[in-house]
Every structure is written in C-alpha cells, then in structure tokens.
C-alpha cells in the first residue's frame, strides 16, 4: 500500500531538486538523492518524472496562492494588502528562483499564455481589480494594466535581482531596495486618472506625428 507521507516526501524532494539544479537538470536520481530513498521507490509512487515535477510545482504554487489569497481575503485596507502581496511575491521569487522560473516555464520558454503561476497571478489580479476599481475611481482596464506592470516587475526582479544593476545601480538582493520598488509601484498605481490619460494622449499624438 502506498504511504501518503512518502509520496509527500518525494514531492518536497522534487521541489528541492528543482531549486538546486533547475527544472532541466532535475532527474529521477537527483530527486531520489534529495529524498534519501531508493531510486526504484519513485516509480512505485509516480508514473514519470514529469508527473512528479508537475505535482510538485502545483504543490509549491498552491501554497503560495493560499498565502496570497489570505492576504486579500482578510484585508482591512486594500492598499496595505496589495503591498503585502507584492512584497510576498518579490521576496518569494528571490528566495526560490528555481521553482519560480520552473512554474513560469510554459509562459517564458514556450510562449504559452498559461501555467500554474501565470494562472494564479491572473486570479489574484482579477480579484484585486474587482475589489478596487470602483473604490479607486479608476477604470477596470487601466487598473488591470497597472497591476500587470507591478506584478511583472516584482517577479522578474525577484528571479534575477541583479539583472539591471549595471544600468540602475540597484541590487534587489537588498530588501530595502525591494521595499522601495514596491512602494514606487504602488504610488504610480493610483496616479490620478486625468494625469494618466493626458500622458497617454500625448504619447499617442507623438506616435502619430513623429
């Protein structure tokens, strides 16, 4: 009879292996080594490495989604909750870049508009937009666009915190810099609509008459 505890141990070992070696270099052997079990045990619990990886990523992202959803569902202040969510994503993707990259693999590497992290973020953004658009007096689509920018910026800089350091001289390994970025993003999120529309119209005219 299959032991659920052993199965869970193998999934956790898969997550560790992905984080250490990357999704491309994670093998049945690296997972078995991380779990401290016999190589043959893995085939008893899972049909393939692909199944293990898929379930492990679903577990990791599911846990993150539960935390994000809790921030939003238990909020007493919309902006404070959104700040917590963005910092959680920023810190989490920095702490677990391998798993974050792997969970975005379908979107980043294959160009597919789907994937577990992608789907999670879509659900969270949708809930935030529905909850804040009327209160913030910002059109639904404009708020959604701004949130996409904020979520993308935190994820990309979390995965690769020094990617833009040569140009910006900002290292996002330093938490103070991560906090500053999130606060800057939030400040721009609720930029007055009239000002945003004026800027957009000016840019559109420049495109028409270069």
Question: Residues of each region from the PLM?
Answer:
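Helix-turn-helix
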Residues: 9, 13, 17-51, 55
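Amphipathic alpha-helical interface segments
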Residues: 13, 17, 88, 153-157
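Hydrophobic alpha-helical connector segments
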Residues: 55, 69-95, 140, 146-150
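Short, basic, alpha-helical segments at the C-terminal edge of helix-turn-helix-like DNA-binding modules
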Residues: 58-63
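Amphipathic alpha-helical packing segments from all-alpha helical-bundle domains
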Residues: 64-70, 111-137, 145-148, 160, ...
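Short alpha-helical scaffolding segments that buttress acidic/His motifs in well-ordered protein cores
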Residues: 86-89, 103-107, 150, 154, ...
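Amphipathic alpha-helical segments used for helix-helix packing
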Residues: 93-115, 160-166
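C-terminal peripheral helix-coil segments that are non-catalytic and often amphipathic
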Residues: 126-134, 153, 159-210
């Amino acid at each position: 009879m299959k032991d659920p505890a052993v199965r869970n141990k193998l999934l956790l070992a898969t997550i560790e292996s992905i984080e250490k070696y990357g999704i491309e270099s994670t093998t049945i052997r690296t997972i078995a080594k991380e779990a401290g079990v016999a190589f043959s045990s893995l085939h008893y619990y899972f049909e393939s490495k692909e199944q293990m990886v898929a379930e492990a990523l679903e577990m990791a992202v599911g846990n993150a989604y539960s935390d994000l959803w809790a921030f939003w569902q238990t909020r007493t202040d919309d902006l404070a909750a959104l700040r917590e969510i963005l910092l959680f994503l920023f810190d989490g993707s920095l702490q677990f870049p391998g798993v974050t990259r792997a969970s975005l693999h379908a979107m980043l590497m294959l160009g597919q508009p789907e994937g577990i992290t992608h789907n999670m973020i879509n659900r969270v953004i949708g809930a935030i937009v529905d909850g804040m658009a009327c209160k913030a007096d910002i059109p639904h689509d404009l708020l959604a666009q701004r949130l996409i920018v904020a979520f993308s910026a935190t994820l990309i800089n979390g995965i690769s915190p020094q990617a833009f350091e040569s140009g910006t001289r900002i290292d996002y390994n330093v938490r103070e810099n991560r906090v500053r970025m999130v606060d800057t993003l939030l400040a721009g999120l609720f930029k007055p609509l009239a000002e945003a529309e004026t800027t957009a119209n000016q840019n559109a005219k420049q495109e028409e008459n270069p």
